[in-house]
Amino acid sequence: MRWALAVLLAFLSPASQISSNLEGRTKSVTRLTGSSAEITCDLPGASTLYIHWYLHQEGKAPQCLLYYEPYYSRVVLESGITPGKYDTGSTRSNWNLRLQNLIKNDSGFYYCATWDR
């Protein structure tokens, strides 16, 4: 039996240069286990900033999943993150977090944040 998986999304910005412009389009997504999901964050003018994605699950501290390093044009996974599970990329002023092969434990709040390093 396949279970439906709810992925709740929230978008916050720790003190950053563009915090007033940081907006998330999607507030909630529900997907079946084994499927994929994409979360979009609007970040105008963020092409030279580090883009970070976090997961916050109930009763746990927020966990940084990955970040995009603009000077090397690469995605850096944090320690302990399974390669291929998450990816990020941009289209104009939008940054997307892609989640693959969803499981029940992927439920939580996903945050995008920007830093200048």
Curated annotation (Swiss-Prot):
Keywords: Adaptive immunity, Cell membrane, Disulfide bond, Glycoprotein, Immunity, Immunoglobulin domain, Membrane, Receptor, Signal, T cell receptor. Its main location: membrane. It comes from the Eukaryota. Disulfide bonds join 41-112. Glycans are attached at residue 105. The keyword Glycoprotein applies. One of its GO terms (biological process) is adaptive immune response. SMART domains: IGv. Coiled coil: none annotated. Probable non-functional open reading frame (ORF) of V region of the variable domain of T cell receptor (TR) gamma chain. Non-functional ORF generally cannot participate in the synthesis of a productive T cell receptor (TR) chain due to altered V-(D)-J or switch recombination and/or splicing site (at mRNA level) and/or conserved amino acid change (protein level). This is Probable non-functional T cell receptor gamma variable. It comes from Homo sapiens. The gene is TRGV1.
